[in-house]
């Protein structure tokens, strides 16, 4: 622990020390960490980014040349993803598209990796259509059948659990092997539309459509590839997008950004949308409050997300007096001790309420004594511009044309 780039008491468990190290690593990437050690770490990360770039482009070449075959499941597969790591507002978009397709009569299943979810001690029991027990080795984690929620966030993962809880009539399946999950969704759940959550980089399964999200405030993240930056792929790989969604817009023109995006993709329809807060909901009681409830209240924010600045700024924009900011690593699983320690700090500072994100709320253990109310901020997506393109997307998915329709053909547009 003495070797860590920050002071950690020797009594602190290794798990907590590693969590702090992960937060520091994010601070290095985003430029928040200063000093000699942070500078040296950035130099090392920059060198590794060159290696990472070569690996990414080689992998794309392998699939483009078909040296490694993609799997086709005989049904419609749509990927929703981004070029960067986190922060684009993907989950609300997945929820919106899933709900829209469901309402139009499609039998939708969401396929997710279940990032940082825990492994089940034993596979779930599932009976095949013929009444026999489904083979355990072919069984993914079934979060929701669309009618019943079967797993909690610990075993499902944050986003899959949140989506399953919010989407009646939409199945949610988790497995690192999305081909395996897709086969189960089609064969056992009767899905005719598979939404590949965070699926742009998942090339083992053929996509009919790739929807790529671009954060208006940071279109290409920090501008550098992993691990020095937040880019998973070079910007030129945007050429693989079938549709581009610019997220977190505020209604002002995006002409300069659109011109930049057109350098990499000249044909994909561009849709502009906003991620707006709708209401506050108490984490444990479900009681809802209007957004005006925040105005002039002494507030503490706690989160474990990739880019917390936007979340915290949103709280301030709603008129809250944000006095305490507590940041954990992305997808951090809060312990009761951590929450109670944070709540004690809030009491000592006379905070009137605590606000977190909806994704973090699913990981909150209930404290023994809740001295300050804890709310999550419900965020929903609204299309601002590109309604025709959005309607065209929905129409093509709900009413597929003849096989010659270019949007439903197998895509080979991998970056050269």
What name fits each language-model region?
Residues 114-265, 270-272, 279:
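Phosphate/Mg2+-binding loops and adjacent switch elements
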